[in-house]
């Protein structure tokens, strides 16, 4: 019933609000006591709203509080002021706040206000134990319950009464606490742990005050070791030296300890599962020095040190020698001595072999005597050895041999291995390769194996070896090795001795040459586009020739040549560039050809002209012969010509409508040798304008051609007969 009544009132109020007009005048926030507060203080954020309305009663509105754009509190109210209370402000409460008022479909939001909380609350420190044994572990719990993670924790381990921090651990936790383990060391006695918490606020880390834990008491697991030295007091070489290290172990230790005795850094004695370790040795001066005793468990190590001095009974012997380097056959003389000349027992040794039990030793040196020598001197139980003396006995080198590894002829620029070897003589051996009497390369070998040098000769060369070793004899020389080098052909060139333009009929000489090459050299001459050479020559020279005594047009073209020798590649031979040769005719030949051509042209023209006139004459003779019979032809003396081959025709006038003239040779077939005079009859018809129609004028013209002796000029006589109008 009450719920229904409340809903009715709310509905009524909302309906009233919809009917009334309102406006949100302003909205802002205030912070109490301030926008900046200390950690743990109460913080009150107020949202103040100013609303105007036509209603007589206050309108109901909604107020929302935001921190960093996330809503943290909201309330429905009719009041002008609403508050958001934080009882104890913490660092995580720092941020940007704003509030929003909502009334029906209208809302308004304040600007953002920044809240800062300074300081971090104190953390809490707890320990899992207050008493611990050396080598144990203490677990420290540092927590900050009031703050929100992530939290930065810093925990330190300190010795009570000092400010020295023995260990520090930093850790960022995503929880508001952290658990850290601290091992307990041998130097720890009474400990305290200190914890400090930090929280990142914006870009600044705010830290709490450091909080100290309760005290932790540390108990020893074992004591610091102690030394016992026997004999006490002065220790002399030959005495029996006892060095004893003693440790007291408590019942709380669950791990086995190890005791170690060291001289300098060398371990001389150890003991496990015991409370002591002993080092016993006959005292010698070299055993003097700094001794350390260490007691170690899994995590704990304790140590103490002592200085032991041993008095020398007699000094170390010295081995004297004539020379450390002897030639084979020289005297090897050794002597062992002790400073102060005490009575002692001596031995002279080579490595581990005793050569003499006396103070001196001599012999003729052999190469096998090379090695390290020493001597000993003994008084009572004390025996001392001298330092090692290296002695080398050198055998003289034999004459070295010299040879090369080439299996065939040596080609210019190719590598060749030249070896030097002395089969006898003490190593190491130094070989010097001499090239053209000058030092070229040096090699040292540690055996009698050959020393191999590498060279790339470019011409015939002489090599010699010089060998040397530790022997005092001067260096020995090998024989001279002469190396013959063959050079492949290089830069093939083809040329012509005269000009590239050769006159026909003159001599033509081609030359093929190389810049360099070992003879014999094979030269081959080629003409372009021909697979086989037209000339080949094998000569002991760097050039070859091809001669042609009379050049013709056939020799015109492109030429090249190749050259090869023993050093050339089997696949290809070096080739020259191409040479162009042109052959031209001699001037007199050109003139002769011109004369012949002109004569042929003239003869052709004469024959053509003669044929032309003969055709024309025949063409005219045919109509004349058809018009009238032939008449005998009279000579100049009115004599009849009687040769049967001569045909004389006399022409009379006839009607020629077309008016064409006709010409016919008279004695065409007569033998030219028997005929001195030839006649040609020409008829000319003309029509005079004053004559009547049907009257025709005819004129006959005879041309006489007389043939005379060829050496004389040809005489021509002409005779003309004519009759006009019957005259």
Curated annotation (Swiss-Prot):
Keyword Ribonucleoprotein recorded: no
Lineage: Eukaryota, Metazoa, Chordata, Craniata, Vertebrata
Modified residues (Phosphoserine): 718, 723
First and last residue of the signal peptide: 1-17
Cysteine disulfide partners in this protein: 47-99, 142-195, 245-293, 336-375, 420-465, 512-561
Processing and modification events after translation: Phosphorylated on Ser and Tyr residues by src kinases after cellular activation. Upon activation, phosphorylated on Ser-718 which probably initiates the dissociation of the membrane-interaction segment (residues 698-718) from the cell membrane allowing the sequential phosphorylation of Tyr-702 and Tyr-679. Constitutively phosphorylated on Ser-723 in resting platelets. Phosphorylated on tyrosine residues by FER and FES in response to FCER1 activation. In endothelial cells Fyn mediates mechanical-force (stretch or pull) induced tyrosine phosphorylation.
UniProt region (Membrane-bound segment which detaches upon phosphorylation), positions on chain: 698-718
Entry-linked SMART domains: IG, IGc2
Keywords assigned: Cell adhesion, Cell junction, Cell membrane, Disulfide bond, Glycoprotein, Immunoglobulin domain, Lipoprotein, Membrane, Palmitate, Phosphoprotein, Repeat, Signal, Transmembrane, Transmembrane helix
Region listing for May play a role in cytoprotective signaling, in residue ranges: 710-727
Membrane topology (Extracellular): 18-590
GO biological process: angiogenesis; bicellular tight junction assembly; cell adhesion; cell surface receptor signaling pathway; cellular response to mechanical stimulus; detection of mechanical stimulus; diapedesis; endothelial cell migration
Renumbered ranges of motif ITIM motif 2: 700-705
Record-level Gene Ontology MF annotations: protein homodimerization activity
Top-level taxonomic group: Eukaryota
Residue ranges constituting the Ig-like C2-type domain according to the UniProt record: 40-126, 135-213, 225-309, 315-391, 413-472, 488-578
Record remark on domains: The Ig-like C2-type domains 2 and 3 contribute to formation of the complex with BDKRB2 and in regulation of its activity.
Modification Phosphotyrosine occurs at: 679, 702
Cytoplasmic topology ranges: 610-727
An annotated GO cellular component: protein-containing complex
Source organism (scientific name): Mus musculus (Mouse)
Chain's role: Cell adhesion molecule which is required for leukocyte transendothelial migration (TEM) under most inflammatory conditions. Tyr-679 plays a critical role in TEM and is required for efficient trafficking of PECAM1 to and from the lateral border recycling compartment (LBRC) and is also essential for the LBRC membrane to be targeted around migrating leukocytes. Trans-homophilic interaction may play a role in endothelial cell-cell adhesion via cell junctions. Heterophilic interaction with CD177 plays a role in transendothelial migration of neutrophils.
Entry keyword annotation includes Transmembrane: yes
Matches recorded under PROSITE patterns: IG_LIKE
Localization of this protein: Cell membrane; Membrane raft; Cell junction
Glycosylated position list: 74, 141, 309, 345, 360, 424, 540
This protein's name: Platelet endothelial cell adhesion molecule
Chain positions covered by the region annotation Disordered: 642-672
């Amino acid at each position: 019933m009450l719920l229904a009544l409340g809903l009715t009132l709310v509905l009524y109020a909302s309906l009233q609000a919809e009917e009334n007009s309102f406006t949100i005048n302003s909205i802002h926030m205030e912070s109490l006591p301030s926008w900046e507060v200390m950690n743990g203080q109460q913080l009150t954020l107020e949202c103040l709203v100013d609303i105007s309305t036509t209603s007589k009663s206050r309108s109901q509105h909604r107020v929302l509080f935001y921190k960093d754009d996330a809503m943290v509190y909201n309330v429905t109210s009719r009041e002008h002021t609403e508050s958001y209370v934080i009882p104890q402000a913490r660092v995580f409460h720092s941020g940007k706040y704003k509030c929003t008022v909502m009334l029906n479909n209208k809302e308004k939001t304040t600007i953002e206000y920044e809240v800062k909380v300074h300081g971090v609350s104190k953390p809490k420190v707890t320990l899992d134990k207050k008493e611990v044994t050396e080598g144990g572990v203490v677990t420290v719990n540092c927590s900050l319950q009031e703050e929100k993670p992530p939290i930065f924790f810093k925990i330190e381990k300190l010795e009570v009464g000092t400010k020295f921090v023995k260990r520090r651990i930093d850790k960022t936790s995503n929880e508001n606490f952290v658990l850290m383990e601290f091992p307990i060391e041998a130097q720890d006695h009474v400990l305290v742990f200190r914890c400090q918490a930090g929280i990142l606020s914006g870009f600044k880390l705010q830290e709490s005050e450091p909080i100290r834990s309760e005290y932790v008491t540390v108990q020893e697991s074992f004591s610091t070791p102690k030394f016992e030295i026997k004999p006490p007091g002065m220790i002399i070489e030959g005495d029996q030296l006892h060095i004893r290290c003693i440790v007291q172990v408590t019942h709380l230790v669950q791990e086995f300890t190890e005791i170690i005795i060291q001289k300098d850094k060398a371990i001389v004695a150890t003991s496990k599962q015991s409370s002591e370790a002993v080092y016993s040795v006959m005292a010698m001066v070299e055993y003097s020095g700094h001794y350390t005793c260490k007691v170690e468990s899994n995590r704990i190590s304790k140590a103490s040190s002592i200085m032991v001095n041993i008095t020398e009974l007699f000094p170390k012997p010295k081995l004297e020698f004539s020379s450390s380097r002897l030639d084979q056959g020289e005297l090897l003389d050794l002597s062992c001595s002790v400073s102060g000349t005490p009575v002692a027992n001596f031995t002279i040794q080579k490595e581990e072999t005793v050569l003499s039990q006396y103070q001196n030793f001599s012999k003729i040196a052999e190469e096998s005597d090379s090695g390290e020598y020493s001597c000993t001197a003994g008084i009572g139980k004390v025996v001392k050895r001298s330092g090692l003396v290296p002695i080398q006995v050198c055998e003289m080198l034999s004459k070295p041999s010299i040879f090369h590894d080439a299996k065939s002829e040596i080609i210019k620029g190719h590598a060749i291995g030249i070896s030097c070897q002395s089969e006898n003589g003490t190593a190491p051996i130094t070989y010097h390769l001499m090239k053209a009497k000058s030092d070229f390369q040096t090699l040292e070998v540690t055996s009698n194996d050959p020393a191999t040098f590498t060279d790339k000769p470019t011409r015939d060369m002489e090599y010699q070896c010089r060998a040397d070793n530790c022997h005092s004899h001067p260096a020995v020389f090998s024989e001279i090795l002469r190396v013959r080098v063959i050079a492949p052909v290089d830069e093939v060139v083809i040329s012509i001795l005269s000009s590239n333009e050769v006159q026909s009929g003159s001599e033509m000489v081609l030359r093929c040459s190389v810049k360099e090459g070992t003879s014999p050299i094979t030269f081959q001459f080629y003409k372009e586009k021909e697979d086989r050479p037209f000339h080949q020559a094998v000569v002991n020279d760097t050039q070859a020739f091809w001669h042609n005594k009379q050049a013709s047009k056939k020799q015109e073209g492109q030429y090249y040549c190749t050259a090869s020798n023993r050093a050339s590649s089997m696949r290809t031979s070096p080739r020259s560039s191409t040479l162009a040769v042109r052959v031209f005719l001699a001037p007199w030949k050109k003139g002769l050809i011109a004369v012949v051509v002109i004569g042929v042209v003239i003869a052709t023209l004469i024959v053509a002209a003669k044929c032309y006139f003969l055709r024309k004459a025949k063409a005219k003779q045919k109509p004349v012969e058809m018009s009238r019979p032939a008449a005998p032809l009279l000579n100049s003396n009115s004599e009849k010509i009687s040769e049967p081959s001569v045909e004389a025709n006399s022409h009379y006038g006839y009607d020629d409508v077309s008016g064409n003239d006709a010409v016919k040779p008279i004695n065409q077939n007569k033998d030219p040798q028997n005929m001195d005079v030839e006649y040609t009859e020409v008829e000319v018809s003309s029509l005079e304008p004053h004559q009547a129609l049907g009257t025709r004028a005819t004129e006959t013209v005879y041309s006489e051609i007389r043939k005379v002796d060829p050496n004389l000029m040809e005489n021509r006589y002409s005779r003309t007969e004519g009759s006009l109008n019957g005259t």
